[in-house]
Amino acid sequence: MSEHLGAMGIPHIVLERKRIAERWRSERWDSLVANGPAWHDRFPGLKFDDVGPDVFPPKERMAQYFEDYARMLNAPVRTGVEVRRVKRNDKRPGFTVTTSEGTIEALHVVAATGPFQVPTYPNIVPEDSGIQQLHSSAYKNPGQLADGAVLVLSLIHISEPTRRRG
């Protein structure tokens, strides 16, 4: 989005609560890789020089790639700025954005928060059952899991390393 806005000469800023791609770095499991191979999961004008075209880049490399791309574009990224509230203005166009560093007035806002901001657990297992439930946002590797049977809902990226562990 920033690339296209910049190319059209539209002034904008990108606010990042922490570093660029922080969730890739610290809020995902150890074995996470991109959803596609390097030849496919890339942006125009920036290839993965150190990753083979058919390799699915690991999360650390993806995070660095996003940083490299922002730098290449000279994108107006402000890191360490938390957006606390976005409110549509009442009697005038635009929005008031309240951040950890003050207030920003904007005509338009693009909310690109990414998925899964708040972990959700299926309401199947009673809390006092003694069964460990671990959301993917807290999962790092199979070493966190108790011995015994495991049920993984939806994530092959977590299921496969868990299966290999036994």
Specify the residue positions occupied by each region the protein language model found.
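Glycine-rich FAD pyrophosphate-binding loop
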Residues: 6-27
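Glycine-rich active-site loop/strand segments that organize a redox cofactor
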Residues: 22-63
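Helical element adjacent to the flavin cofactor pocket in flavoenzyme catalytic cores
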Residues: 60-77
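Glycine-rich Rossmann-fold phosphate-binding loop(s) that bind the pyrophosphate
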Residues: 17, 153-156
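Beta1/beta-strand and adjacent pyrophosphate-binding region of the FAD-binding site
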Residues: 1, 148-153
